[in-house]
Amino acid sequence: MLKREMNIADYDTELWQAMQQEVTRQEQHIELIASENYTSPRVMQAQGSQLTNKYAEGYPGKRYYGGCQYVDQVEQLAIDRAKALFGADYANVQPHSGSQANFAVYTALLQPGDTVLGMNLAHGGHLTHGSPVNFSGKLYNVVPYGIDAHGRIDYDDLAAQAQRHRPKMIIGGFSAYSGVVDWARMREIANSIGAYLFVDMAHVAGLVAAGVYPNPIPHAHVVTTTTHKTLAGPRGGLILAKGLDETMYKKLNSAVFPGAQGGPLMHVIAAKAVALKEAMEPEFTRYQQQVAKNAKAMVDVFLQRGYKVVSGGTENHLFLLDLVDRQITGKEADAALGHANITVNKNSVPNDPQSPFVTSGIRIGTPAITRRGFKEAESRELAGWMCDVLDNIHDEATIACTKQKVLALCERLPVYA
């Protein structure tokens, strides 16, 4: 018999110490990694529930195991909420991650060796959009497209490449692009050659749900997303679609199970259901609106201080600082800001002279700081502190002073009150 009072702290002090140190780090550091966010205690309650004990291969009403009547209800809630939130008529909530959701779409729509157009990783794309080190670049013939001199997607070049290479699928979406994607134009280009348009909206799903960013569902054949990032749920993936036939939906389901995964993580699916319900609340819309406002406020400060922002601004939750002219590498900036308790990630910029392990830029996102209560004033103040550190990157006194300011602000605006 298992006793409910069993806990990690009394049993595994080494592990518990590391876990508690991470809790402290999250509370005492300002999180600016665009793909990270803080999920609600309700979501964590679902993830820590007894649903973790249940195996449920298959789909609601069509399981390979008995005893699934209640987890069927859980998964159906998640499916129905995902469809309602994004205006889809199909949803698969089982992918363990965004990458696995993307893998399922590839295998459902393509054959190995088929040609795909995907955004260049160095221009803001994602590993699963055709990077040679990823399955997408190894199994498929990927032709990269990119951004123009102004940091915007070059749709004319994309259209020309589509005509030249005749891909079977065009991928929209990004991991480091600060503009608004013209989904309708991308569908038009795909239609001109009879290709699928597949959109990975992982980074902007929360903004889309709140109506702050254009919804790709009416334009794409298939859409995937993660459930963390701007959506602020558990780590996991979704596949969404609208207007396809049942045959295609069955292919997508089969590509997830049994094609790519075995049993779904029912405790995570329950957490997805909670997060999707939270995303339907008016408070969530206000949160996403503030995410965008905070990003613009930070960009304004960086521009005023003479820093180069790729594309000159932001229309979503993130932006890239190009540090080439400053003769600072992304790795150096990441480390210096980290010493001041400000967490960012180094990121390649267009035409980056440095390797992906060093880079010449940093990516900055506002979902996490907004989640802990930052408004424009705090965002501008934070951007100013970051400029102080980057202007004096080897000055330990500046970094130490900034760290004290960060600690005070974190104490005033905790993640979990």
Swiss-Prot record:
CDD domains: SHMT. It comes from the Bacteria. Pathway: One-carbon metabolism; tetrahydrofolate interconversion; Amino-acid biosynthesis; glycine biosynthesis; glycine from L-serine: step 1/1. One of its GO terms (molecular function) is glycine hydroxymethyltransferase activity. GO terms for cellular component: cytosol. GO terms for biological process: glycine biosynthetic process from serine; tetrahydrofolate interconversion. The record marks H228 as: Plays an important role in substrate specificity. The modification N6-(pyridoxal phosphate)lysine is found at K229. (6S)-5,6,7,8-tetrahydrofolate binds at L121, G125, H126, L127, S355, P356, F357. Keywords: Amino-acid biosynthesis, Cytoplasm, One-carbon metabolism, Pyridoxal phosphate, Transferase. The keyword Cytoplasm applies. Its EC number is 2.1.2.1. It catalyses: (6R)-5,10-methylene-5,6,7,8-tetrahydrofolate + glycine + H2O = (6S)-5,6,7,8-tetrahydrofolate + L-serine. It holds the Pfam family SHMT. InterPro entries: PyrdxlP-dep_Trfase, PyrdxlP-dep_Trfase_major, PyrdxlP-dep_Trfase_small, Ser_HO-MeTrfase, Ser_HO-MeTrfase-like, Ser_HO-MeTrfase_PLP_BS, SHMT-like_dom. Its main location: cytoplasm. It is found in: Cytoplasm. Its cofactor is pyridoxal 5'-phosphate. Belongs to the SHMT family. Catalyzes the reversible interconversion of serine and glycine with tetrahydrofolate (THF) serving as the one-carbon carrier. This reaction serves as the major source of one-carbon groups required for the biosynthesis of purines, thymidylate, methionine, and other important biomolecules. Also exhibits THF-independent aldolase activity toward beta-hydroxyamino acids, producing glycine and aldehydes, via a retro-aldol mechanism. Homodimer. PANTHER family: SERINE HYDROXYMETHYLTRANSFERASE. This is Serine hydroxymethyltransferase. The gene is glyA.
